[in-house]
């Protein structure tokens, strides 16, 4: 139920606000498409977490690029700061 409300909010944004604001997302897929995919794939909690970390990375100083929704659910106790600074595609494996 909560997931459906969040999906409705994102779809409302895409319908009402996005055409007025223009396309300024630096990532592929766009942040709103990413949000819809994350919510539908991982549910309300994990999808919201992924959406918020993605929005925090989408700024003028970010290189952007391809950043698909991960197939696995995120670990909430993992290194949040690192996830905000570096997209998952740019992380180096240890």
Curated annotation (Swiss-Prot):
UniProt keyword Methyltransferase, yes or no: no
Membrane topology of the entry: Peripheral membrane protein
The keyword Metal-binding is annotated on this UniProt entry: no
Disulfide bonds: none
Keywords: Cell inner membrane, Cell membrane, Membrane
Compartments (UniProt record): Cell inner membrane
Assigned GO CC terms: plasma membrane
Top-rank taxon, per record: Bacteria
Alphabetical list of PANTHER family matching this protein: MEMBRANE PROTEIN INSERTION EFFICIENCY FACTOR-RELATED
Family, per entry: Belongs to the UPF0161 family.
Function: Could be involved in insertion of integral membrane proteins into the membrane.
Protein name: Putative membrane protein insertion efficiency factor
């Amino acid at each position: 139920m909560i997931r459906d409300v969040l999906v409705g909010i994102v779809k409302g944004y895409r319908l009402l606000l996005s055409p007025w604001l223009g396309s300024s997302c630096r990532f592929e897929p766009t942040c709103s498409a990413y949000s819809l995919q994350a919510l539908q794939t991982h549910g309300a909690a994990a999808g919201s977490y992924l959406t918020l970390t993605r929005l925090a990375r989408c700024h003028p100083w970010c290189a952007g690029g391809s950043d698909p929704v991960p197939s696995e659910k995120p670990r909430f106790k993992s290194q949040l700061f690192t996830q905000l600074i570096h997209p998952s595609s740019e992380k180096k494996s240890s």
